């Protein structure tokens, strides 16, 4: 059977790590031929999707329309095959999902059931509810948060539950490909705390800066905070650092070698998120065996309850800045004393029962 993974986001957010991990899982399914439909360039091949995030507004709109048309034609011509669509709960997902649902064998891989910045919009939520209730038949679920949204949407189809796929790629870094700003962001004699990925309010960049502002001077002398990623809505400007020398801020696309460099050199990965349904940043931290310092939200609580040696969970209090500051301070004070990633937790993480169950259920569904 031909299996097509549909990823319109692609190069815009570094989705190739996830796609490659997913393909490795699908390779275990007998007689499966897998292709990723994305906007990544391959030598001698035209990309399936145009990069709808590059250029002026007219180019972006034209690319989006072209992508819709290209996908509907492809799905119609290959409707006997299987399509797996990666959704992030954005408004532009709605037509993409409707198109993919034209194939009887479709599976919606839900990264977010509705995007975090629009989950209070009743009109958009109703549109997703209509789609899940009337058109979508099969989904992949990574978290309880997604399950709750599906219940709210009256979704009655098949739910395949699985943790975020474990990354598997080379950890070697080609130093010439690493920008000087990234090389200079790490201070070897300091405790380097990394905030990585797309920067927005939901991911709590303001909570992190506020927390660092509240640390005492002794702790501040020990740390270097590296913020690396794209800031689409100027979220980083919401709170000003009390001491800008504690921060190295890189607001741009981070290439693969720079990602490896930052994760290899950092001491901790900060996750001060307000909400999330899953986190590739968390999985990347685990892949590099870097402990996380995480806010007290259900997804992180669930992960660190299962793998307690993988990081530190902040207390569950209303003042997120104070709470994260105390957790940061306690973690730095015990740096070099607390041990992380013990053998039992790591073995359980690598050989998760949920992953094996997912492979079995997915294979059975594919061959129905």
Describe every region a protein language model picked out.
Residues 134-159, 166-168:
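A short, active-site helix/loop in glycosyltransferases that binds the activated sugar's phosphate group
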Residues 66-67, 83-103, 277:
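An aromatic- and histidine-rich active-site surface loop
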């Amino acid at each position: 059977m031909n299996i097509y993974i549909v990823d319109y986001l692609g190069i815009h957010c570094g989705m190739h790590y996830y796609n490659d991990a997913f393909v490795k899982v699908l390779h275990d399914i007998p007689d499966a031929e897998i292709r990723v439909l994305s906007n990544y360039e391959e030598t001698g091949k035209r990309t399936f999707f145009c990069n709808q995030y590059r250029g002026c507004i007219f180019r972006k709109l034209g690319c989006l329309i072209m992508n819709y048309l290209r996908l509907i034609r492809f799905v119609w011509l290959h409707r006997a095959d299987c399509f797996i669509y990666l959704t992030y709960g954005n408004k532009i997902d709605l037509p993409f999902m409707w198109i993919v649902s034209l194939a009887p064998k479709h599976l919606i891989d839900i990264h977010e059931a509705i995007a975090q910045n629009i989950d209070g919009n009743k009109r958009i939520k109703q549109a997703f509810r209509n789609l899940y209730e009337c058109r979508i038949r099969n989904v992949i679920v990574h978290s309880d948060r997604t399950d709750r949204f599906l219940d709210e949407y009256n979704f009655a189809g098949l739910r395949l539950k699985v943790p975020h796929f474990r990354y598997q790629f080379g950890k070697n870094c080609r130093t010439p490909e690493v920008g000087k700003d990234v090389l200079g962001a790490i201070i070897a004699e300091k405790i380097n705390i990394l905030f990585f990925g797309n920067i927005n309010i939901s991911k709590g960049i303001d909570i992190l800066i506020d927390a660092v502002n509240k640390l005492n001077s002794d702790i501040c002398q020990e740390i270097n905070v590296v913020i690396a990623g794209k800031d689409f809505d100027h979220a980083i400007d919401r709170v000003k650092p009390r001491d800008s020398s504690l921060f190295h801020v890189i607001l741009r696309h981070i290439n693969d070698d720079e990602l490896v460099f930052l994760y290899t050199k950092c001491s901790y990965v900060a996750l001060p998120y307000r909400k999330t349904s899953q986190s590739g940043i968390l999985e990347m931290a685990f892949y590099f065996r870097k402990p996380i310092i995480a806010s007290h939200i259900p997804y992180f609580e669930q992960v660190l309850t299962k793998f307690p040696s993988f990081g530190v969970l902040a207390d569950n209090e209303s003042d997120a800045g104070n709470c994260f500051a105390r957790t940061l301070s306690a973690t730095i004070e015990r740096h070099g004393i607390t041990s992380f990633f013990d053998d039992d937790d790591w073995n359980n993480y690598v050989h998760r029962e949920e992953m094996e169950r997912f492979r079995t259920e997915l294979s059975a569904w594919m061959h129905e």
